[in-house]
């Protein structure tokens, strides 16, 4: 068995919805950013000790507006993680979900490090109502370095995520995702 990636979590409150999730998930919330950055860097060292060169995490609800006053400081944090991992020969991947494909693309471009990419969670883009995975590949496909296959349905209210379901019974269209990844 080959471990291809290490998913690195973080401490503090975590709420997986559209309201509290904005304030609790990933590196976006300023109240938890520094601590979580250090936890991700420690997790990356642990991954390296296991021989794993890819670190994945949810960064959180990236600002859609590039002029959001919190965006520059978030980029500094993400660039520090990317540069630290690069020095150790590791890649840093965004687990998809809370962000639109174009916002994720812009953020990767703005970080400007060659070791930054995408771990495509085929259900999360649906569960958060941000995209379908087939079309998302048109936007950030060249950055996909890992895939986390799941399936699900879009949200049916404005507060809670969509519903995750058994692979093949939701909207992910995994056959087309895989076909497109192999193009």
Residues of each region from the PLM?
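Acidic/histidine-rich catalytic cores of soluble enzymes
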Residues: 6, 69, 75-171, 175, ...
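Short acidic/polar active-site loop segments enriched in Thr and Asp
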Residues: 2, 53, 145
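Glycine-rich, aromatic-flanked loop segments that form ligand/cofactor-binding clefts
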Residues: 2-15
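Aromatic- and glycine-enriched glycan-recognition loops and surfaces
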Residues: 1, 35, 174
């Amino acid at each position: 068995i080959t471990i291809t990636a290490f998913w690195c979590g973080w401490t503090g409150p975590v709420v997986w919805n559209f309201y509290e999730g904005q304030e609790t998930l990933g590196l976006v919330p300023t109240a938890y950013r520094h601590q979580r950055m250090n936890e991700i860097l420690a997790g990356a060292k642990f991954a390296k000790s296991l021989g794993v060169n890819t670190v994945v995490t949810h960064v959180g609800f990236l600002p859609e507006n590039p002029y959001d006053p919190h965006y520059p400081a978030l980029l500094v944090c993400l660039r520090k993680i990317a540069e630290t991992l690069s020095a150790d020969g590791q890649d840093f991947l965004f687990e998809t979900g809370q962000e639109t494909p174009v916002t994720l693309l812009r953020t990767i471009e703005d970080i400007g490090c060659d070791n930054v990419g995408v771990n495509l969670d085929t259900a999360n883009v649906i569960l958060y109502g941000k995209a379908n995975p087939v079309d998302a590949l048109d936007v950030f496909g060249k950055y996909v370095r890992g895939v986390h296959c799941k399936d699900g349905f879009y949200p049916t209210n404005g507060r809670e995520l969509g519903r995750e379901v058994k692979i093949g019974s939701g909207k992910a269209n995994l056959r087309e995702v895989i076909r497109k990844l192999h193009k």
